[in-house]
């Protein structure tokens, strides 16, 4: 996984609860002379929420994030992929909800497709064998995914796609990763980003590990030791960070005041995701990132 700066930085989509975006004819826009009139972030968010309410004449379409699971022609999806990714995406959804609520924007979060009560994965089997896919295969995989979704009546040019790639190999505690792991741009209509799937990847792996498991992980260099906790923080954190790019969020840094909470998600927050569940400070959403998601 590498940090990639996305060139297209337009607002895409994140679903807001109807109570927050619904029409409210009694809402009046407060007046002010200067943005600096607001003495706190909470005052800013209250004002912005009132503006959004007053300009909403109809409920917004509940447009959902499409999660695609891609795997090669000569392989099957990685073990327990549906169960693990249901847990991962539910936690990511909860992260956005909690952070947006903390910033004063009610229950704003990503909207996920569900099937039989769990996350719906659009499974796409590639046309090439495993050996033909690498970290640089994003464009190739994108084309195959777009074609497969088109056959299902989905126009990928108007969707936000998180493509989870089953491009890794696990041999006991040795993990080799060769999946695309980056965003490929976003605007108000669409976005696309890639992440990797591995057998050891799960929400349980973010919580204290009494067994003190050490993995040997190879991605861009040789094998490196990772605790199970660090492995899941880095790669689930990488998933939500790249999804941020898919939702048009640029890289940013926390203000001095914000930094007391931990690390900005769209800064180096992919390396601190859910560390607060164990020891230390985790990742958080900056107010500037939140504003792009409204």
Regions found by a protein language model. Give the residues of each.
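Bacterial Sec-dependent N-terminal signal peptides
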Residues: 1-27
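Propeptide-to-catalytic entry region of secreted or membrane-anchored zinc metalloproteases
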Residues: 29-185
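Residues that flank catalytic or metal-binding motifs in active/ligand-binding sites
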Residues: 63, 189-191, 261-262
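An active-site-proximal "capping" alpha-helix that borders the catalytic cofactor pocket
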Residues: 92, 246, 266
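A structural motif
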Residues: 183-220
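Short pre-active-site segment immediately N-terminal to the catalytic Zn-binding motif
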Residues: 218-239
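Active-site recognition of the HExxH zinc-binding catalytic motif
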Residues: 234-250
């Amino acid at each position: 996984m590498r940090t990639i700066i996305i060139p297209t930085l337009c607002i895409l989509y994140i679903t807001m609860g109807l109570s927050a975006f619904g029409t409210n004819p009694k809402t009046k826009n407060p007046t002010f002379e200067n943005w600096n009139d607001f003495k706190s972030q909470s005052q800013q968010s209250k004002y912005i929420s009132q503006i959004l309410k007053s300009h909403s004449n109809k409920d917004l379409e509940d447009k959902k994030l499409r999660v695609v699971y891609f795997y090669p022609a000569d392989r099957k999806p990685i073990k327990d992929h549906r169960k693990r990714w249901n847990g991962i995406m539910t936690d990511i959804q909860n992260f956005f909800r909690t952070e947006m609520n903390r910033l004063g924007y009610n229950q704003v979060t990503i909207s996920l497709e569900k099937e039989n009560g769990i996350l719906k994965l659009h499974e796409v089997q590639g046309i090439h064998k495993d050996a033909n896919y690498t970290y640089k295969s994003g464009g190739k995989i994108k084309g195959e995914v777009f074609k497969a979704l088109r056959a299902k009546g989905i126009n990928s040019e108007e969707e936000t796609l998180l493509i989870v790639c089953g491009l890794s190999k696990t041999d006991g505690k040795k993990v080799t990763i060769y999946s695309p792991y980056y965003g490929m741009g976003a605007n108000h209509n669409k976005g696309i980003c890639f992440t990797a799937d591995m057998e050891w990847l799960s929400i349980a792996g973010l919580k204290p590990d009494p067994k003190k498991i050490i993995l040997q992980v190879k991605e861009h260099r040789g094998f490196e030791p990772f605790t199970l906790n660090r492995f899941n923080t880095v790669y689930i954190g990488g998933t939500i960070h790249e999804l941020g790019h898919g939702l048009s969020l640029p890289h940013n840094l926390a203000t001095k005041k914000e930094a007391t909470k931990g690390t900005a998600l769209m800064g180096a927050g992919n390396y601190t995701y859910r560390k607060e569940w164990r020891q230390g400070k985790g990742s958080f959403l900056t107010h500037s990132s939140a504003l792009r998601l409204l």
